[in-house]
Amino acid sequence: MTGRVRTEATTGLSAFPLTPLRDDRVDEHAYVELVERLARSGVDSIGALGSTGSYAYLDRAERRRVAELTVRHAADVPVIVGISALRTSHVRALAHDAQAAGASAVMLAPMSYQPLTADDVVCLYTDVATELSVPMVVYDNPGTTRFDFTPALYARLAELPSVASIKIPPPPPEAEAAREHIARLRAAVPARVGLGVSGDPSAAAALLGGCDCWYSVLAGTLPGPALEIARAALAGDSGEACAASNRLAPLWDLFARHGSLRVVAAVAELLGLAPEDCLPRPLLGLRGRDRAEVETVLTALSLTK
């Protein structure tokens, strides 16, 4: 894989759908509907089994099946499959399954029970890279992994030919600070390695500041408004991108208060895209006043697609 460059799967808008459950089993019908909806929407890639897809709560057989369903129903849209797990041998097995399913790329976060060192993380990615014939996205998500990457660690991992993109946490919200932050990260990695942002409220600033990709929670359920932000930002239209993002401020506020997963699960349930109580236990969906507030925001913003 020497000389691999960023691919279509790791540029533009990447939509990460829920993996809805019904009676503690993956609701394949609902999941396929979500994937086909995304395939028709115009997103640049579909990210299966990300944090929004509850990968950490699914066993290997469930994850293999989800990967297969995603590729089968994504039409010609590239598919990124999450392969994160606690043990390296399990990650390698998941990488095998993802590639066998036809994934265009894989995404890996350094999951742990015992705290990991930087050397542990380099070893993980190096070991997994030997199994890959597709690009890999390094997933930096300290909110769930409790592991903090540094620019120096990005640089070490970017030496691996498999690494095509790094999914970074939200940059500072101010435009100039975001540009400076992203420029520092770009200086740490080769030009062939892209930078993608997670944290939907920061996406407009990050794309305008130099990120190549938005790895989006919102787009997995509501691709329409996410596409408005992404297309404007990637075209350099800061006014329209920021305006489109600012219109969603009530939704971003819900993300901040309840977590994006619970909010998009409620959105999907309210729109009939997922069954009630679609999250894996012990995660509880929003109820009562919190759920009613999500419905109020959906109605006020006319969010249906």
Residue ranges and their predicted role:
Residues T2-G3, G12-T19, R37, S41, ...:
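C-terminal alpha-helical cap/extension of soluble enzyme domains
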Residues P142-A256:
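Catalytic alpha/beta core domains of metabolic enzymes, predominantly
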Residues G3-D148:
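Active-site beta->alpha loop and helix N-cap motifs at the rims of alpha/beta catalytic domains
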Residues S41, R65, L69-H73, D97, ...:
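Alpha-helical structural signal in soluble globular domains
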Residues Y31, R63, A67, V91, ...:
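A general structural signal for well-ordered alpha-helical segments in protein cores
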Residues V32, R64, E68, R92, ...:
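Generic alpha-helical structural signal
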